[in-house]
Every structure is written in structure tokens, then in C-alpha cells.
């Protein structure tokens, strides 16, 4: 608004004052039973939510644009706005309308942003809502991210080139970025001024939050840029939440050496939790996820995106799955109990932020009651399961408190009452008794008034609009006693109030209001009592989530015929009978394949027809390796995995239109990243490098890339190609082996065998695949003819499409033998007689052909 606030009405001045503090957020301004939005906010909300935009009254001489949503259904509108990346400020009425001479006082009660969600109705139970802050110090970036609902605070430092991989792994819902950082992200980005990233102030703020004198004990004291980011993030959370954050008790430094690194392209190509089209299935997570709780689902997602390099931690998970797989009854019992558990992690966060709801506490109470059974259902073997059994130890004090304090089936919201259990508070019990006794009093009053008035049809009733009243028919109205005062006249009845009924009404309604106020105070006090227990509750939640994942993977191990991977100190990837878990779930029969990679067999050069299974084979090797590094069982007859530091994939590509990059540029960028970043302990998957340019350029690039990987990088590499010339590299490098996937022609059909065999492929079957794809017959015929001509002329194929050419069966007759003699003929060396003899010879050849 460009008009000075003083020119507006008092209520609009109040609105604009609040709006000025949050100019880039939508303001939900409470007015009675609605949240109203005004001016530009109203226009934006009407467009995004498809609600009515109207005008009401005027301020500063102009109509006020307005849109609103009902108070009781505001949550669904908030969810839609947050999904669209908007942030919302909620201003509630805090003053008494009856006592206010001007506008009712309003204050901001909360600020809701995509990365600070804790409300159950706004959160996706299958994924964490994370908020990230990024600070800049030269070429170094300091990054902090927080799961507010769970109280997990992490930091790292990295160079700018590593940021895309971190964003792909963490997947923040909201980013707070230094004003000078050039950043492209898939989530809302809020720019913060440079002064908000002051490292000294950040260090003090963080130490104060954690109750320590400094940050030495957290392992982050020397990470100055990361501390600056964490301080800016904490300041933002304090501003938006407007409450203490007692569950934020520590911060953890994350380092690249903790994880097997995957860049953004690899996560996308392997379809870990999202397909290339953005769908949730079919993906690795959709195949593996049979967890019973939101906590378990989120943890499994985290594991898949954070494969570990710590062999002890990975082996502990693998062995725990093995114990549960060997005890299917225990795993099934655990699953049954976990289905009945509430989301303790998020409930704990809401308790800490003092925005828990009644059913959060009843859900927590019922979950705590299940802990002894859960602990008893865990098998006694294995160190990891023993630690989890200790972690879910019962909390009798908290459980007993909640049993005493909360109704067995409380109301969904506090304002409805019926939340605090009877017997918990004497004052509340007394107030409730007054309300409960109203029914008996009204029946007794109705009997007395019928006798006193002589009106047998007289009724004593109540409604929320008019309160208590005595109702008689219009025909009986003349018979009512003199102390009856008319309260309401309807078509067929009259409603009255007596002094006695009025006195009771005042007492009863006052008791109801006082009971609601008392219940609210008791509930808030109960949250205060529970807050010191939040760290323990979050530990229990972490254990429940891990038990859920381990039990689900024990079930998957049996159902999907998975095996426990072995870990080797020698550098290798040896998989026998490996299968692609996602593809196998989609097809009736899947052909298993082996892979052997070690220091004497570093690269497999894979040839074969399109649709033959090269990409599936490469991806399954990567997925099996990744699953093993997550501590999961794998789809194979056996698997032995050495130390792996990174997994790279360059499989398929498309134009980056927004970034102005062609398909070939995307391919080369991803390839360059691999060549710069891969080490001898990396797993690299490359599919058809060089196909996006001319044949000679592409072949030269593919040859150079393969040669560099096998001779310089020495990474474990699966290299699929249609450049058959590359198969000759096996003669130069003994660490490179040729393998192929074959197909067989059966009449007019082409049967793909999907089996990996040693040696190079003999054909690509490109024209047959084109025919299977429905390319018109004349085009196929022309392609065969051109292919024959190219082969006969021994020409090097030029266009990209010719890379699929190979020795194909021909439909046409073979070349005439006279043509061979003509090709060998040199007219300049022939005498006239020799020329005549040659002519007769050629004539004889043509006469001999049918």
C-alpha cells in the first residue's frame, strides 16, 4: 500500500501495522469466525485458493479488497498455501470485543512457513520438513539445517560446487540464503541480510540455546561459516515460533566422510524415492517400505539417501535384520504393535513448542502403554536390538501422569472441553458438576412449572443462541404466571424466562465458561510439566522408528528373497544372481545376472541391443551396492562389497531448458563432474557417452572418457555403449572386460535374453527394435538398404542413428558379381582388345545370373 497508514480507518491501521512487520508473507487477520485477508494479500489468496474476492467498505477513500476463510477450516487452506511455497502470519484477537473502545486488540500468534511446520494436519507424515540456512565466506559455504518437529540440528561446510548434491540429499522445504548467494532451488528461498550471518553473534546465540558457555563440546567451534548459518537459522526460528525451543539441545557436524556420496543426477537416475516423472512409485522406497508408522517411513527414506561408510554401523543394521528375519513371529508382533503407535517424534516436538493438541497427549499416553510389550517382543539376540530394547524402556511417571490427566477419548480441540479427565482437578470437577446437574434441575423445574401454571405441554429447554427458556403453545400463552417474561415469539409458541431460570442460567453458563478456562489452564500446565521429558520422548521415538524399519526389512528379506551382504576389506563388488528390485516387482520373470569388479577387473564395457537390459543391469548393481551400504539386505544370491566412497550415474539425459543447456551439454556436465570427483573407491555408471553429437566426436569422447576412467581414475565402472570400436580397449587394458546382453531372432520376432555374457555383442539389432517400436515399413526397408550400402562401402557411420547399425540380415538379393569386377577395373590401362574381352566376360556373367 502506498497510502500513508494515518489515512486509513483505525482497524486498517492495525492491520497495516502488523502487515508491515511481515511484508513478504500472507496475513490471516482474525475477525470473528473468519480469517480475513486485505488488499494485495486478498487478491493473491483469491487466486491461489480459488476463493471469492470482494470489497467491503472503504479506507483512505478506496474500496477495501477482501477475501476470507472460515476459522474452523483454516488448516486446509494453510496446507494448500504452504504446498505452493507461501508463508502465512496468523494474527488472533486477544482483546475483549465488549470492552474495546476501538478495534479489538490483535497480535501475531504464530508464523507458519514451509520449513517450520509442526502441525499434524499440515505435515506430510512420510517425509521430514526441513529448513536450511546458507552462509557465504569466499568460496566456502556454511550450511545449517533443522528438523524443527524432531529437534535435529546439523551443519556442514563445503565449496559451492558441492551444494547441488547436498540440496538433493537434504531436500529442504525452505531455504534462508545470504543476500549475495546466487542460488537456484526447488523450494522457497528467503533472502537474509548479511548482518544476520554474523559468526560471533551466532556462536553466542547457539551457546545460549544449548545452555553451554561455548560450542567446543559440539565439534563445530572451528566451523565459523557453518556457525553463522546456524545462528541465522536459529534467529529465524525464534522469530517465527514466538516461544522457547527447549528440544533444541545440541548441534551436530556432518562430514562427507560419514556417507557414501551421491550427486543430484545419481539420486534422480536411481529413482530412490521419486521417479524421473516425480511420482512416489515405482521407486526403491515404494518397493521396500512396509513400515507401520510415519516415523519408520521417514527413517527409511533418510537411510536410502544417506548410505554409510561406517562398516560397524552398517553391519549392526544388517545383523539386526537377520535376527528379526529368523524370528518372523517376533517381527509380525512388532509390526502389529507399531501400527498402534502415535507419531511420538512429532508429538514431542509439539509439546516442546507448546502447540500440542489433546489427541497428541492421548496418543502419546497410549503409545507409552505399549512400550513394555514392544520391548518384550524384541528378540534377545544382537547388540543393536539390545540397545533398542533399552531405548524403549517404559516411562511410568509420564504415562501415569497422562492417564490421570487426559480423558480416554478427549475432544480434538481444547476449546470444545472434555479434555482433562475427571478427578484430576477438584475445581474443574466442581464446575463440571454444576453443568451436569443442569439436566436434573431443568426436569424438576419443568414439573413444578407445569403444576403451577396448569399447562401440561409446557417445556423447559435450551439452545446456544437464546440460552434457557420455558416454551408454551401460543394458545396457552394467556395462562402463564405473572413472573414469566417473554424471551422470544415464534409462529406457534412463546418462550419465557423466569427469575429462577435466569439465576440458574447465569450460574450454569458461568460454570461452563469457567470450566473451559480452567481446562485450558490445566492443559497448558500439563505441557509445561511434560517439556523436561521431551528429550527422552524423542529418544524413544528414534528407537521406535528404527525398530519399525528393521522389522519391515526383515519381512522384505523373506518376501523378496533378499540376502545379507558381506563386506570385504579388499576393493571389490562381487554380486551373484543380482536383481533390480523395482523392475523385478513390475515383471513376471526377471533374469538374474552376476557382476565381478575388482582391481584386476575395474571396468565392464557393456554392449548389446537397445531394450536388451543394459541400463537395468547397471542400475541394479548401483542399487544393490547402495542398499548394502544402508545396512539393508539385497536382491541377490550373494553379494560382497568393498569400501565405496561415492556412486555416480550418467544414464539418460534431457534438455535443461530453464538453464539454457542442451541434452549433450547436460551429458557432458555430468560426465565432467564424474571425471573430476570419482576416486578408485567410487562406483561409476555411464550409459552411451557421446551419443548427443556427431559420430566421430562422440566416439572420440567416449574412448577418451573410458580410457581415463580405467587408467587414471581406476574407479569401478560400468560403461554401456553402442560404439563397438570401444571394445578394442580390452586389448590395451587388462583391467577392462567386455560383456554383452544378447537377443535372438525368431522368425519375424526379436527375443531379448537379458542375460549378461562375456565378450562384445555381435549386433545391436537397432532396425529390429525400430520395427518393434512401430516405425513404418517403408522407413525400415529404406534403413536396411542404406545400412547395406554403408557396410558394402565400409563407411564409418556418421549420423547418430547409424550408431545402432550392425551386420543385419538383408531382405534384398546380394550385389551382382559383375559389380565387383567393374570396381576393380581401370579403363586407362586397358587396350582396345582387352576392353572388348572384358565386355564379353561381363556379358557372360549377366547371362549366367537368373
UniProtKB/Swiss-Prot annotation:
Annotated InterPro entries: DNA_mismatch_repair_MutS, DNA_mismatch_repair_MutS-lik_N, DNA_mismatch_repair_MutS/MSH, DNA_mismatch_repair_MutS_C, DNA_mismatch_repair_MutS_clamp, DNA_mismatch_repair_MutS_core, DNA_mismatch_repair_MutS_N, DNA_mismatch_repair_MutS_sf
Gene Ontology BP, a term: mismatch repair
GO MF terms, alphabetically ordered: ATP binding; ATP-dependent DNA damage sensor activity; damaged DNA binding; mismatched DNA binding
Origin organism lineage: Bacteria, Pseudomonadati, Pseudomonadota, Betaproteobacteria, Nitrosomonadales
Entry keywords, A to Z: ATP-binding, DNA damage, DNA repair, DNA-binding, Nucleotide-binding
Highest taxon, organism lineage: Bacteria
Name the record gives this protein: DNA mismatch repair protein MutS
Cellular component, GO, one term: cytosol
NCBIfam families: mutS1, PRK05399.1
Organism: Thiobacillus denitrificans (strain ATCC 25259 / T1)
Function per UniProt: This protein is involved in the repair of mismatches in DNA. It is possible that it carries out the mismatch recognition step. This protein has a weak ATPase activity.
Record family assignment: Belongs to the DNA mismatch repair MutS family.
Gene: mutS
Record-linked PROSITE patterns: DNA_MISMATCH_REPAIR_2 (PS00486)
Residues given in the record as ATP binding sites: 608-615
